[in-house]
Structures are given as C-alpha cells and as structure tokens.
Design a protein with these regions (language model features):
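Short, flexible helix-loop junctions that flank or precede catalytic/ligand sites
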Residues: 1-4, 8-225, 229
Length: 234
C-alpha cells in the first residue's frame, strides 16, 4: 500500500521513539517488520529485536540483526531491553511496551541516541500518549511528558477493515509525527487537542483515522462507509 511505503520511507530514522499501535490482529508486527526491512536495505546498523514470539525472520543485508524471543532467549521485555543496551545497538525493536519498567527503559534508550520501535494496544495517537503517561505514578507524570515530548518521532495507529469486495481486509493508518506543535501538546498535557492537529496537518504527512477511513471509502476500498466511531478521534 502507498501508506505503508510512506511510513517505511519516513521512519528509517537515526534516533527517537516510533510507536505502532492498534488492536490485536491489526497488523502491527507486519508494519514493524517493514520498518526493520527498510533499515536493513539502507543502513549499516546494529539492530536488536525483542519479540514474543518472533514472527518474521530477518536476514543480514546492510544491517546486522539479532532477534531474541521472550521466554526462550530472555525472561522479560524489561530484562531483554536492559541487556540489549549493553550491546551498543543502533536500533531496538521492543515487541510490546507492557509495563512501567519497559516503557521507562524504552524512553531512556531513545533519549540516549537509539532508534526504538515498539507497540501498544491503544487505538489512536492521543490515547497512546495518555496510556503511556497513565502507567506512571502522578508525581512522575510531568517528567515523563517532558521526556516523551523530546523523543517521540511518531505514533502510527492502524486498523484492518473489510474491503469493498468482502474478500479481504485493508489497513487504515492514523499517523502523527512528533512535530513542534505535537510536542508542545504532550508537554502541556493537552493531548485532547491532538485530533484537531491531525485533521489540519495533512501537508505535514499526518492524518486522523477518520480521514484515513474516508480516503479508503472514496477510493472504493471499503465495504461500507465509515462512521465517526470507526476512527480513533471520536
């Protein structure tokens, strides 16, 4: 899909935090594998993936990729992430940010110059930011907002929707970049305004889920017309 190519091209970055979110079965692992594949094609990078389970095997091309499976090669995401940081990777893929320790370590890894990819089961960019902040106790939340505003490069939220011919599903992507206005909203605890920014920033490559669904419908790719509650901004 064109959207997937746009995501691949934009997020082969050098550092920062890129989150891919959505419900179970929405294709998050496929999107992450595509991003790692892009890096493998273009960068002489050391990549460590931490997965539960490993779904896609990556061969070495330009990048050196070490894949580790939670439960087989390591006890937990938090333990695996701490161990990975001692190996001086350029890129770390964390299959899922499940708990405070993993989230905190992933943010720290992004702060210290690594490119970190991970997933959450949230729907929508604003809900993703809120979920991360809410994991932390109240006295830490403002500091986490500041850290997250610095390191966040993107939130890609996706859904799989039945196609017009009812023979398959098509991916719809909400895309939020870590622009200065977005970073300011995160820092100021105004995530409720993110949906408004997404609706007016398409020239910057951002799009709300409602608009993404409408685009698919207008291109005759959806079986039914999208309702506002189909999107992540409702």
């Amino acid at each position: 899909m064109g959207s997937e190519m746009c995501i691949r091209d934009r997020y082969a970055k050098k550092r920062g935090l890129v989150l891919v979110t959505g419900p179970t079965g929405s294709g998050k692992s496929t999107t992450l594998a595509s991003l790692i594949d892009k890096i493998n094609d273009e960068r002489n990078a050391h990549v460590i993936t931490l997965e539960d389970p490993i779904e896609y095997l990556h061969s070495h091309r330009k990048a050196m990729i070490n894949q580790r499976e939670i439960g087989l090669d390591t006890h937990s995401y938090a333990d695996a992430l701490r161990a990975a940081l001692r190996e001086d990777p350029d890129v770390i893929l964390v299959g899922e940010m499940r708990d405070l320790e993993t989230i905190s370590t992933a943010i720290t890894a992004a702060e210290t110059g690594h490119l970190v990819f991970s997933t959450l089961h949230t729907i929508g960019a604003a809900a993703t930011i809120d979920r991360i902040i809410d994991v932390f106790p109240p006295h830490q939340q403002q500091q986490i907002r500041i850290q997250l505003a610095v390191v966040l490069e993107a939130v890609i939220s996706q859904q799989l929707i039945p196609t017009a011919d009812r023979c398959g599903r098509v991916a719809a992507f909400e895309v939020m970049h870590g622009t200065i206005p977005i970073k300011n909203l995160i820092r100021e605890a105004k995530t409720y305004q993110i949906s408004s920014v997404l609706q007016t920033a398409r020239k910057e490559g951002m799009i709300s889920m409602d608009d993404a669904l409408l685009d698919l419908y207008n291109n005759c790719l959806l079986y039914t017309s999208p309702s506002p509650r189909d999107g992540a901004t409702s």
